[in-house]
């Protein structure tokens, strides 16, 4: 009996210990399938940061921190993180308000109220939960009472229609925010004086505009759904059940979507008058499942494979799991399934928080439908076929995405109007000062006065993602990538009518003109016409108020179409020699493919590129950009002066070949037939530098199971990997003996589904068996997508949790952009499907 009692006590003690949180070597708390992170991330405006809870492979809540509004948006003040210390079983983070580096200045300026405070957030285990304690060095001023408090945001996408409890109250998370409303005084009547004089100052009144403003959105909010001391989210589901108990002031459950359409559900408690020590104390108790293990995720291309291309599957598993045995490759036919191959996966090792297995089935070449099975997990069904890339893979970029993004046009698709003719009232000269989204107008950089109409700029261009602005690097960059795609692969496609004179686009109505070249033309038009109007490059064109910037809906609704009034967009200029030269290179590339298609525009592109190059200095800081321009100008004109400059840069090229190699490779190949000593020395040195670069690439690619250089950060890495694959193609095309083509396939497969995380969707919307069909584009308010748009992709919840949510308002995961976001992907597909090397550009005849 005594032995039984002792055994029971020991088992109880072991169970209790197993169910308490432990601080692990990665700097966060873990118990079973639940992780609690504290300030490993700091991106609060993107709903990443503060105290974060991950339960059984899903991020449930985040951004646990002091905020100055009940339901802040991305333009409300965020603290500055000063220090983080994870030791002795607890995590203590020191933060402060204000962050003067962001007050009325910076990429997206914020307005901080008059409260200077340093505070600590201490997170530590208590019982089966986590205790969060906030200590302030300065009490909350009267005007912030009822405003300043500790917020915890709950991801809404998992919660619609699901239950919650608050003390004796209960409710269901609604699909849309519901009244009643609360009206209160705004913090904006107490703006601080924190501008430190670095950079230019923003004008909050201008950004506010009239009526509702995202910059001033704390005066009308949703009334809380409930008030109490103990809150439980998802009491019906042990895998997501989370209880929060406040040991200080009341908890209130708010709906952040009432004053910001992209808001989350917010649980908060306000800081009491005079409180400093223990100003906030919360006990957070997630339901812990000790037995939960991450189920295997099979990662393959959601589109499929050419018969002859490499085929490799990556299987993501719980790091505590042992391999489950063989992987089965199943072929699906009219009479059912047949196992065509049993493969024992190779243990690749650990990356992020998972153990990875890999298997190769490149020798399977018979066309058909296939699926991979491993344990209880199954991949999507995919094809092996010689025509796997020939329809609905790269084509939606040209067929849908780029036409839909076109500015100054009415875009129709049969019954559907994607958007009406927009921004025909472009544009007024921007006011001097710091604006939004990185726009910053400096004095003395325009021959137009502030607010003066700049004529002739209401043509061409694409809206950049959901922001509706035209950035020079996006416009020229997109045209350039498309130009190189056409130059390399000479692809013929005509499924769209484009009429700039009538401002009309008709999707699925051919007009007898190549659609890729029409899109090159569209990008060149906005850059060239703006240059001609301003006498210099524009920085871009963007709306004048924050409400316009955050607009959800038809692009034509942003302005009234009548020129010379306050709703017109602004055009910006800048003094940026590197960007000017990059644009020159891009225009020179576009000029080549526009010859014979639009000769006048081709010559205008070339003239501007030559002018920008000739105006540039010999400053070493712009040397790489100038080299790129010289390469494109030589390929376009054949003029020896450009080649002479390139050859003189041999040292720069070889020492920074990771940057210069891809665009210089075309020149080096042309020089291989030259017999002069200078050319031969250049070719030899360049080849040696490339061989050394390949060694570096191999080391970087070996760091992950995906076969490409990939070091994840807050933003999804899809665009970076696409760009890498795009640049790598020029190396494998010119030097296949050094750079095997397999890396091009690896980069493409990453985009098409072979990437980390439980969501193995294709980043290319509408492409493949499973793809990102909820995205941050112009129709994000409808939880929809644009075919051919490519999202940013799987992000990292630091330090080690890959995440791709089905949610339209996380730009770091699901945004579309111009300047490569989709065109790099399109180029990769064309490169993958091209069996022969491309033809080098032909130099113009003398």
Predicted regions and their residues:
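Extended, loop-rich substrate-binding clefts of extracytoplasmic carbohydrate-active enzymes
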Residues: 68-140
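Acidic (Asp/Glu-rich), glycine- and aromatic
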Residues: 131-181, 376-388
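Acidic, glycine-anchored loop motifs typical of Ca2+
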Residues: 502-519
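Beta-strand-rich recognition/accessory modules
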Residues: 207-291, 832
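Aromatic (Trp/Tyr) and acidic
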Residues: 202-235, 303, 311-375, 388, ...
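Beta-strand-rich N-terminal accessory domains
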Residues: 19-88, 184-221
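Low-complexity, Pro/Ser/Thr- and charge-rich linker/hinge segments at domain boundaries
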Residues: 159-165, 291-310, 379-417
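Sec-dependent N-terminal signal peptides
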Residues: 4-14
